[in-house]
Amino acid sequence: MEPAGLCGFCPAGEALPARYTCPRCNAPYCSLRCYRAHGACAEDFYRDQVLRELRGRSASPSRLAGALRRLREQREAEDEPEEAGLGPGARPGGLSGLWERLTPAEKAAFERLLSRGEAGRLLPPWRPWWWGRGTGPRLLEELDHAANRDLAEPEPAPARTALQSGDDAAAAEPFAEDSCAARPLALPARIPALASLSRSPASPLVRFQLPNVLFAYAHTLALYHGGDDDALLSDFCATLLDVSGALGAQQVFGSTEEALQAAAHVLEAGEHPPGPLGTRGAMQEVARILLGEGPVNQKGYTLTALGHLAQTLGRARKQAVIGGERDRLYRARKKCQFLLAWTNENEAALTPLALDCARAHRAHAVTAEEMATLTGELERLWGGPVPPTPRTLIEELPG
């Protein structure tokens, strides 16, 4: 049964009979042109479907697939109403019905989209909160230049200047300028003294846990679009603790490179989707957080990130019902509180850590470029993306 009445979006005096209904507000409309005039409401509907899918509900694949399928069929109906089966008198049979109408290949393609973590691409780009202060996203040009020097050469403390330029800057900007700005976060109201948390002096290896924790923090925030949805809180923290060995497994690292590679290995092994940042982008965001707003308050971003982590882990622990999960969240929260106190009293250690992150970022970029060059050369020799079938050089003739 088609919608009753006239289209609500045609010009006055020219309204045509309504053929479709908005999936969000049930407003009647007659064509693709009028649907586009009502696009904001429909876009909100599809965004809600994506968020429901990311929550992992069992029925959500049908909701999102149905929404996308409906949009496709309505567009086809505008040009080929008879072939698409959406002419007057025919309407989709509901979201669950549309999922059943997908072919096996279409269902498999949609499930691959979800399993690879690419459904988030349907959401508006998200902008990190640490880009919303001062002059915006910034990474020291000196840090990137220092990453190209001999690593055995002593490094002076770099001065804070401008953004990167050229291809590296473009690669370092995974978030669009018109992306959704994250809400600003405040510094923790109270930071305990380090001596009150531990009777013995902190290990010199404590500093290397920061890059590992911040890598997981930046990656998880981008993957979960800011992590503000309470329905995704458990998944958010599970990803965070899996990527950060320092938080999830109380792992100790002997260098910044080791700490970053431990987190990167989780993503490269396919245990979690790479998200909008990927390995290289997450390394770059760690350096940005460690650099802070500038020399006057360099530790501000790191303190804010650790405070945000401690608060988020505390909220997740209140929701957790399994004892083992609650204990794991408790230990991770205590680790964040310890790192918070350590950072507050060791601001001078942040610049060397940021320099190490820039080196790791540059090394990862060089490796990726070399692999791309090698792959291109092999494909040129092979004449395609796969090697040719080996030819038989010596064949034994039948006796």
UniProtKB/Swiss-Prot annotation:
InterPro entries: Znf_HIT (IPR007529), ZNHIT2 (IPR039646). The modification N-acetylmethionine is found at M1. A zinc finger (HIT-type) spans 7-41. Zn(2+) 1 binds at C7, C10, C30, C34. The gene is Znhit2. Residues 70-97, 152-175 are annotated as: Disordered. Interacts (via HIT-type zinc finger) with RUVBL2 in the presence of ATP or ADP; shows a stronger interaction in the presence of ADP. Zn(2+) 2 binds at C22, C25, H38, C41. This is Zinc finger HIT domain-containing protein 2. Residues 86-96 have a biased composition (Gly residues). Low expression in most tissues; highly expressed in testis; particularly in seminiferous tubules. The lineage of its organism: Eukaryota, Metazoa, Chordata, Craniata, Vertebrata.
